[in-house]
Amino acid sequence: MINALKGMKDLLDKDAYYYEKVIQTCEEVVKNYGFTFINTPHLELCILFKRSVGESSDIVGKEMYEFIDKGENHVCMRPEGTAGVVRAYIEKKLDKNTSVKRWFYHGSMFRYERPQKGRLREFHQFGVESFGNASVYEDASIILMLVEIFSRLDIKFKLLINSLGCLECMPKYRENLIHFLDSKEGFCEDCLRRKNLNPIRVLDCKNEHCQSLLNDAPLLNQNLCSSCQKDFEILQSVLKENGVDFEVDSKLVRGLDYYSKTAFEFISDEIGAKAAIAGGGRYDRLIEYLDGKSGFGIGFAMGIERIIAILEQKEEKVQREGIYLCAMDKIYIQKLLHIATNLRKEHKVLLSYEARKLAKHLENADKNNAEIFLCMGENEVQNESLFYKNLVKKEEKMIKISDLKKVL
């Protein structure tokens, strides 16, 4: 038997139901904020992610699915969504004008890492990217979007925020941090590698011993220039004004190299201690890194599998929908197909091609979470009617075929 590859999972039945629910909820919210859909390729040149995600990241260092294709191109399956969207923004020369572009995307991402609960080698993300707006109020709006999404999905969260500074305040802080790191011994191999490539990423290490060494490290948000400090204060003010609880985490740097200024992360205890379910921030330098005109960008990405795990844990009852249409005798199937074709212009209809007893049909309708049950037998044919049952309200009656649209 051929099985799915390790760390890759089929989405069907209840998982598929929750996937659609999450995507639909996200789309409804972000469209209200003026975002439109963008779709980028799953396969990109490796250099795109090495220049955007960064050589110091675990993604580039350890986790990319990369290979040489038949055209001798060094390519990889996309490990995250932002870089591809920025590439499209630049390739279409949208960086050359001053208009604001707001896009959302969703789809598969690929990272070769150890599979575990809520972490797969092929996983799905929903994300947004906003270009051309330098205002910290855009940062706040992006965060408030996620707050609204999680509110609609009834997911409890903790919001962490930080400021990573800009080109004015970052260099001095970087010097102070390198001096501090050089004075300490015992950091893990990843931290030693990051120290030379991007020392700020050392703060993101999950090793408990490394974190203990960082207890008295200089704090980034205490070394901000006046402009970054003002923006960070405005961000906190907006969140408070909108009733959003948050915590300033001075060691929050996110896992990718391209962030600057605002960084944020949503964590949840509903699928394990402090599991990240979404995160993002501002990346004003990334457009220039990828040969675009210097500009402004901010976005977030949300891990859909982790959201599904939370929703399934809540054991939410799958909502009934659609019509189950069936017959007691096969000779009526063709007539029902004509009825189903007309109903499908406005309704979801599952038509059974099998002749079964009423109880068996009702059992099958229940398994398919149908809301309305319609059945045709000899008596119904003679009266040009159907047996009708609402499987939610438990109401049943005979209805004329000519009255179907009115009843439904």
UniProtKB/Swiss-Prot annotation:
EC number of the protein: 6.1.1.21
SUPFAM superfamilies: Class II aaRS ABD-related, Class II aaRS and biotin synthetases
Major enzyme class: ligase
One GO term describing the cellular component: cytoplasm
Gene Ontology process terms (BP): histidyl-tRNA aminoacylation
Keywords linked to the UniProt accession: Aminoacyl-tRNA synthetase, ATP-binding, Cytoplasm, Ligase, Nucleotide-binding, Protein biosynthesis
Catalytic activity annotation: tRNA(His) + L-histidine + ATP = L-histidyl-tRNA(His) + AMP + diphosphate + H(+)
Localization annotation: Cytoplasm
PROSITE patterns tied to this protein: AA_TRNA_LIGASE_II
GO molecular function: ATP binding; histidine-tRNA ligase activity
HAMAP family in alphabetical order: His_tRNA_synth (MF_00127)
Subunit structure: Homodimer.
Full protein name: Histidine--tRNA ligase
Gene that encodes it: hisS
